[in-house]
Amino acid sequence: CNATAALHIAAMALGVKEGDNVICTPMTFASSANCIRFCGGNVRFVDIDPETYLLDINKLKEILSTAPKGTYKGMVLVDFAGYPHNMEEYRKVADEYGMWILEDACHAPGAYFIDSTGERVYCGCGKYSDITVFSFHPVKHITTGEGGMACTQNKEYYEKMALYRTHGITHEAEKLQREDGLWYYEMQELGYNYRITDIQAALGTSQLKRARKNVEIRRELVRKYNEAFVSISEIKTPYEAADVYHAYHLYVIQVEDRLGLYNFLR
């Protein structure tokens, strides 16, 4: 099991089907778009904001405004490097065009933005996005060796994902088509074996108590990097707005001669 599996069942729960058009950022790992292709959907890439590396909301509005409403079913938004979207603004756009939001927060556990009410909106809380996915890959903030998680506040999406992750099988009495003893279960959908083991789950939960501290350590390292690079005009360090708390899975810099720097560091 992994975040790719979580993205897949999230797309299934959202109802992505053959021919559906979905918007995605090109600045991500393949799974963010492939989860739509797994379901037969079509992916339309929309360019990023060069400061945040997130899907550019102005370009998004431009594309949506030139297409008939209903052309696009949803959007996959990736909190790249740990920088959270202002989901409140994207939610307004999604609602205007009748779209759902699948948030790929694999880089961003613990990240948040401040919304118009002054509330800290953490990635995964579900206030504005329909489903959020996290990764427990070895290099992520929390690891289970390999694994992923999908979060939602929507009961319908939750029940669908719970079914899809376990072969489409249920033991829940109220959902069974007949009563035939406590041993009885039914396969009601074509599902998958998308479950991490109990040992992996225990490994992951054991890290929760230090999850916030781990983000703080990353942010302190970023502060030191920024101080070290402040006098080097050739290096552009990561941007962070005042209303954002960046989780810094990655420390992304921009330079004029990327290949030259790469070869030098080798």
What are these regions, as identified by a protein language model?
Residues 12, 34, 38, 62, ...:
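Short, well-ordered alpha-helices that flank and scaffold nucleotide-derived cofactor binding pockets
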Residues 1-21, 35-39, 45-47, 116:
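Phosphate-binding glycine-rich loop
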Residues 48, 138, 166:
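Short, conserved catalytic or interaction motifs in soluble domains
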Residues 20, 26-28, 47-49, 105, ...:
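Nucleotide-sugar donor-binding loop of glycosyltransferases
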Residues 18-21, 71, 159-160:
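Short acidic capping loops at alpha-helix termini that bridge into adjacent secondary structure
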Residues 51-144, 149-157:
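Active-site phosphate-binding strand-loop segment of PLP-dependent enzymes
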Residues 58, 74-78, 83-90, 96, ...:
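PLP-dependent aminotransferase class I/II
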Residues 23, 44, 101-102, 133, ...:
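Structural detector of well-ordered beta-strand residues that form the stable sheet scaffold
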